[in-house]
Amino acid sequence: MELICYVAPGWRPRIRVAEPSRPWMDDTPESYAYRCLPLSIANSHGWEILSPCTFAVRWHGAAEASSLEIDLSEAGSAEFVPQSLLGSGILTIHVEGVLRTSPGWNLWVSGPPNSFKDGIAPLAGIIETDWSPYTFTMNWKVTRPGEWIRFEENEPVCFFFPIPRGGCDQFEPRIAPMSEDAELEAEFNDWARARLEFHQKMHREAPENPSDRWQKLYYRGVLPDGKRGIEDHEIKLRICPFTGRGSS
């Protein structure tokens, strides 16, 4: 599968494989947040685009584009700097590249998952990048007028990953009683009993080793009886970095 970032002369996008760590997860007691495998997988499930410069924004609350003030005093010599184009407190960051995916694949684009910035939130979009010759922008919406919000140079400002076009349309969702799937119901009941017993044991006598304080069934990809759930269970992603160089 291909994912290419085509660049024009002077474009130097700062793209890296997404980082799995988050400062707030580091700060949880014993970094326990990393025990949640879905969080860690989501954090690293794609690529990040980094800010080309340090800047700060403040929205004065009006709908006009001029109501968003952008301080570029620390932007240095960055050629592509954030702008206020759309109004309503929306900050626009240009992506220096035309991204091209294999046929039938879109890109999901937003801010880094499980990462929070006080006073501003990333917007999300899905782009048909297998045919479009157009660039796109990463946009953030200020949620707290009157406050300065700072972005550092090389701070992740965009996160993207490929998704198959039409994937959701192929599903026929429904709600059903668990008794409809006898095997699933039995496995769920086994897990529920084991989970209750595990927590009761932890309450009676907590183990000294922090890793023994959680069951790790899902993390290890095993069913309640210890058998593997699937062969391709993922604990860590091995995403390739972008290679090559653009025009000078």
Tell where the protein language model's regions lie, with residue ranges.
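Non-catalytic terminal segments and appended small domains
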Residues: M1-S132, P145-R150, P156-S248
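Aromatic sugar-binding surface patches on proteins
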Residues: S132-N139
